[in-house]
């Protein structure tokens, strides 16, 4: 770039910063634009599937799935993890169905959780926007998009047609919210329900409510499904759950996590640690016995999980090792760099 162009660019940048504030324009490599702060989901498998160790701050996230698949449980787990990190959280309960006792069981500090039960969809989205603009709230959950009913629909008659009203309302809200969330580094999680498209002969007939705007504006979209039951003898004590990362703007998409959601307890973290530890050879399995660092920790997965629960410092150590192994970017791993260099020399 010649000197005249450099001077013109410097003058233009100076004018933009003077008018719109410092940091309104910058080079992509500057500052912390490449580092995305994340909040753990409470599930190690899902954190690894997301590729960044959790859900990204300052972004919109959509979680959808069939009824009773664990959508609200997942968001409550995220709230609990965010609160442990000292963050302020809010729950917009449009479905009027939040159970504070269940939230408390999952580790949510309900005394510190802001909660709103709005009357209309517009009111709910205005509250979300006001909280985002305040800069004091770090995480907002909206449960659910399907329950965000436009004011005109609430005030109208039962049989009235309101074509595209909710989609227009959400589209306008997304345009306003995206910038405000980014500026205040606040994450907004929208829970959504599934509907069926009529007359679809080929392909997936499932779709989410509220139009297409949320699909475009969301940085992460998670599809959560119940795949089976967790049994203790004959008693069903939880759900086998599969969570698929359908869209991911912060890492590679289409990965999936297999986990268990236990009734009244949330994610089976210890079971995940055992499974991932065996898979990545940090936990040894001989027959039904599990060993860690040469010491036997239990016969059968249930006993090994119980040992991890009773010895949280060992669980934390294994968790740390797995995160370092699976969440370090490929280019930062020395053995991978050496292997690539050797391959290049061969060619």
UniProtKB/Swiss-Prot annotation:
Residues annotated as binding ATP: 65-72
Paired cysteines (S-S): none
Superkingdom assignment: Bacteria
GO CC terms in record: cytosol
Molecular-function GO terms, alphabetical: ATP binding; ATP hydrolysis activity; ATP-dependent DNA damage sensor activity; damaged DNA binding; single-stranded DNA binding
Database matches in InterPro entries: AAA+_ATPase, DNA_recomb/repair_RecA, DNA_recomb/repair_RecA_CS, P-loop_NTPase, RecA-like_C, RecA-like_N, RecA_ATP-bd, RecA_C_sf
Primary residence: cytoplasm
Localization: Cytoplasm
Gene Ontology biological process terms, A to Z: DNA recombination; DNA repair; SOS response
CDD domains in the cross-refs: RecA
Keyword annotations: ATP-binding, Cytoplasm, DNA damage, DNA recombination, DNA repair, DNA-binding, Nucleotide-binding, SOS response
Similarity comment: family membership: Belongs to the RecA family.
UniProt function note: Can catalyze the hydrolysis of ATP in the presence of single-stranded DNA, the ATP-dependent uptake of single-stranded DNA by duplex DNA, and the ATP-dependent hybridization of homologous single-stranded DNAs. It interacts with LexA causing its activation and leading to its autocatalytic cleavage.
Designated name of the protein: Protein RecA
Gene, per the UniProt record: recA
